[in-house]
């Protein structure tokens, strides 16, 4: 949440796991620069701002942190500051340059959206890698939600059946086309270095505490889902 003091001073806080559309809206509001200026840059696929591997999408490429947007003269200057910081951070974290960067951030963004505890990120990224390796669909609500511009809790069965959504990982094979948020350091490191394990499933069994259980078999996963249903009852 943006603190009142920072907002008043024109400082923008970009949070880990925040979607690019929210960052653009907050940046326009706090800087006083027209939203249309940001929209034009987005429409032009971040030309001269984004690296080639971003594929013309800002999602994932806006480094979390605090930015004095009030002091910046244009939407281009604001977005370039965020992207340049992101590139520097990826270098610092040792993320290989080139197309691997986009892959790492896609996986990191999914992990951050799926669970609310950094302790679980490495297990979620392992589940993703294991499922990809076995040719399984990812079946992640967070990606479906992103493609529908809703929160994961708002995903419906109908949405998971929609084959026209390129982010519907119940229907598409492999990874979605872009990251689904701007992941933070912990999630990126988890994507780079997944925990060792043979898990293929996970389920958050307590939505208050965020307790999440991981499973290697469908039967084991079904037991975890039953535990969630019991908690929800």
Predicted regions, residues:
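Glycine-rich loop/hinge motif
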Residues: 4-32, 95-101
């Amino acid at each position: 949440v943006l603190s009142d003091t920072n907002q008043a001073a024109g400082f923008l806080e970009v949070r880990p796991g925040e979607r690019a559309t929210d960052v653009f809206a907050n940046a326009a509001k706090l800087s006083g620069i027209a939203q249309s200026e940001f929209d034009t840059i987005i429409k032009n696929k971040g030309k001269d701002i984004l690296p080639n591997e971003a594929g013309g999408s800002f999602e994932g490429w806006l480094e979390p942190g605090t930015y004095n947007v009030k002091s910046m003269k244009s939407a281009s200057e604001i977005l370039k500051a965020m992207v340049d910081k992101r590139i520097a951070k990826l270098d610092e974290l040792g993320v290989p340059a080139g197309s691997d960067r986009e892959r790492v951030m896609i996986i990191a963004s999914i992990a951050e959206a799926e669970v609310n505890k950094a302790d679980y990120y490495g297990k979620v990224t392992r589940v993703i890698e294991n499922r990809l390796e076995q040719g399984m669909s990812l079946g992640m609500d967070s990606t479906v939600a992103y493609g529908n511009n809703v929160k994961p809790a708002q995903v419906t069965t109908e949405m998971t059946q929609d084959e026209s959504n390129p982010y519907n990982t119940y229907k598409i094979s492999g990874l979605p086309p872009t990251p689904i948020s701007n992941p933070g350091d912990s999630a990126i490191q988890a994507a780079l270095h997944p925990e060792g394990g043979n898990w293929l499933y996970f389920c958050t069994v307590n939505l208050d505490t965020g307790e999440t259980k991981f499973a290697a078999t469908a039967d084991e996963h079904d037991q975890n889902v039953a535990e969630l249903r019991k908690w929800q009852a």
